[in-house]
From Swiss-Prot:
This is Ribosome-binding factor A. Keywords: Cytoplasm, Ribosome biogenesis. One of several proteins that assist in the late maturation steps of the functional core of the 30S ribosomal subunit. Associates with free 30S ribosomal subunits (but not with 30S subunits that are part of 70S ribosomes or polysomes). Required for efficient processing of 16S rRNA. May interact with the 5'-terminal helix region of 16S rRNA. The lineage of its organism: Bacteria, Pseudomonadati, Pseudomonadota, Gammaproteobacteria, Pasteurellales. It comes from Actinobacillus succinogenes (strain ATCC 55618 / DSM 22257 / CCUG 43843 / 130Z). Belongs to the RbfA family. Monomer. Binds 30S ribosomal subunits, but not 50S ribosomal subunits or 70S ribosomes. The keyword Cytoplasm applies. Its main location: cytoplasm.
Amino acid sequence: MAREFKRSDRVAQELQKEVAVILQREVKDPRIGMVTVSDVEVSRDLAYAKIFVTFLFDNDPEAIKQGMKGLEKAAPYIRSLLGKAMRLRIVPELRFVYDQSLVEGMRMSNLVSNVIKNDEAKHVAEDSE
C-alpha cells in the first residue's frame, strides 16, 4: 500500500512550522522584521531545504533585499536551533527564497478588477446611448 505522503513532504511541513516559530521568537535581527514562511521544499535526500518567505513590507524592494540578507546571515543559527527541535539525522541546509507569488496574485487580481470595472463602465455608456 502506497503512503499518502512522502517523508520529504512531512519533513517540509514540520520544517515550515519550526522555522516560522524560530523566526518569530528567536531571531532578533532588525533587518528581518515581520516575515512569513509561505512554503518549504525539501530535497529527496533531506539535505537541502528551500524556504519561501514573504515580508510585511512587500512594497519596498530595498527592505526586502535587506531582509533576505538578514535571513541568509541567520541561516546557520536557525539550522542549529532546528537540530535541537527536530529529530533528524541530518538537518537540511537552509536556503531562503523570496516568494513573489502573493505579490503577483495581488497584481493579477487588481488587473482583473480593473478590466471588470472598465467593462461595466463601457456597458453603462452603451446602454445610455
